[in-house]
């Protein structure tokens, strides 16, 4: 009973600050989102073109990428704002000292220099199944073009691209990324030049770019990432109900799924790397799962 009351309060609070706009998903979006996190991080170097190709090969219908702007205003695929020394080497194969990593902030570098880093050769103990290949960080447009060519050549279904904007107030102060609106506009310009139509959505933990997308690009699907347990606070911070709500998976309950569905939101939690937990979430009513192992979907019959 207490949970029902809380969810009713949330609905009232958000309705009060949300313009009347009925949520609807494009008809070509999947009934269930089988999302490859950073491609297939469990099997291939994260956020690389080979990782994305592997994801669609093993059955992902949606691939998630993280983006930053570079100094020369290009949309870079990377989870971290500078080299992650756990899996990044200099081009000659030498190690990057921990003290030196922050000398190479992507937003303060041109892409010609960024692409020289090797993000795929170094053994990564956290991901023992990950194939090791020498590969660099791609640009968003390059990645989309490569994946589209790959699925066409191999007669695979065309995926949805989940583009996560790595912005935050903290990153603003550290100059780790461009201002949110600038990142959004750059992503939209890149996507416009590709023949993918509406097969992408924009997500972030940062409410600012999502609010900007809703205002300037109302046709774009929005995903809201959260770690917060308080649904009331989460939705009031955003100011509207997104198309896709993506909480940390341990926060998901059947009541949350029911509430999301009552507001026409899709519930797609992150990041689930255990098959039994996947089954439990599906039983609770989630509309998709973000995982480092999209090959698991076939193994659980999804």
Task: Go through each PLM region and give its residues.
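Phosphate-group recognition and catalysis centered on beta-loop-alpha active-site segments
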Residues: 17-302
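Bacterial Sec-dependent N-terminal signal peptides
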Residues: 1-27
């Amino acid at each position: 009973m207490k949970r029902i009351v809380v969810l009713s309060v949330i609905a009232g609070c958000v309705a009060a600050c949300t313009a009347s706009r009925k949520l609807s998903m494009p008809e070509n979006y999947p009934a269930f989102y089988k999302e490859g996190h950073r491609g297939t991080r469990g099997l291939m170097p994260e956020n690389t073109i080979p990782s994305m190709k592997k994801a669609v090969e093993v059955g992902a219908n949606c691939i998630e990428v993280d983006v930053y702007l570079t100094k020369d205003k290009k949309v870079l695929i990377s989870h971290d704002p500078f080299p992650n020394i756990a899996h990044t080497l200099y081009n000659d194969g030498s190690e990057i000292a921990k003290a030196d990593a922050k000398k190479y902030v992507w937003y303060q570098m041109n892409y010609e220099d960024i692409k020289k880093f090797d993000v795929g050769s170094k053994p990564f103990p956290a991901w023992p199944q990950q194939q090791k290949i020498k590969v660099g960080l791609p640009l968003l447009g390059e990645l989309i073009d490569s994946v589209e060519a790959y699925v066409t050549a191999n007669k695979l279904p065309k995926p949805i691209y989940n583009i996560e904007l790595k912005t935050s107030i903290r990153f603003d102060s550290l100059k780790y990324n461009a201002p949110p609106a600038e990142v959004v506009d750059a992503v939209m310009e890149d996507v416009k030049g590709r023949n993918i139509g509406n097969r992408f959505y924009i997500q972030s933990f940062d409410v600012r770019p999502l609010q900007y997308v809703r205002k300037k690009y109302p046709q774009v699907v929005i995903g809201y990432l959260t770690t917060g347990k308080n649904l009331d606070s989460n939705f009031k911070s955003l100011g509207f109900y997104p198309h896709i709500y993506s909480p940390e998976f341990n926060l998901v309950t059947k009541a949350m799924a029911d509430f999301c569905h009552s507001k026409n939101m899709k519930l797609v939690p992150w990041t689930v790397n255990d098959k039994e937990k996947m089954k439990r979430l599906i039983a609770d009513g989630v509309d998709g799962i973000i995982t480092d192992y999209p090959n698991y979907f076939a193994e659980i019959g999804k």
